Amino acid sequence: MKKILLHTCCGPCSIYPLDTLRSKDFEVYGLFYNPNIHPYTEFKKRRDQLAEYAEQQNWQVIFDDEYRLDEYLQEVVHREARRCQMCYNMRLRRAAQIAKKGNFDAFTTTLLVSPFQKHELIREIGENLAEQYNIPFYYEDFRPGFKEATTKSKELAMYRQQYCGCIYSERDRYCKPPHRKGGK
């Protein structure tokens, strides 16, 4: 059985990838490393929900419990146009490092389940890091299971967030652009 490290952004997004990988006879371990999540209360909700789901699924997850917002901001400030690229790179780099050190056969991410993420960019970064760290990036398009996972997460009354986690996506989700008077 091959051992794979699944970088995990939250409980709901882990449902379909975890089930799929297990059905393919992978021994799946999770990694919760998400320095992008803001504010701390959101980070804690996502972390706690994942811990609860992992226990229900008898799934071992490595939790980086340190709130690393400063590290994330140092990566993206003044690079806002490339913030998703920087964020994916941070999180997948940590997954590749841990997978390599832990003698995993591959690493992947739950980010591949969301139709709202930049799928090809995630794949490209994962493959580049795989080459850099000499550990395979397992690519699978998990998006076909997004609706199924959403339904299941609602049935399980899981905490479901409304934005990717970063302060920029929170702004984009909730803040309406100001109306301008007298012009376009």
What positions do the PLM features span?
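Nucleotide-activated chemistry modules centered on ATP-dependent adenylation/adenylyltransferase
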Residues: 1-184
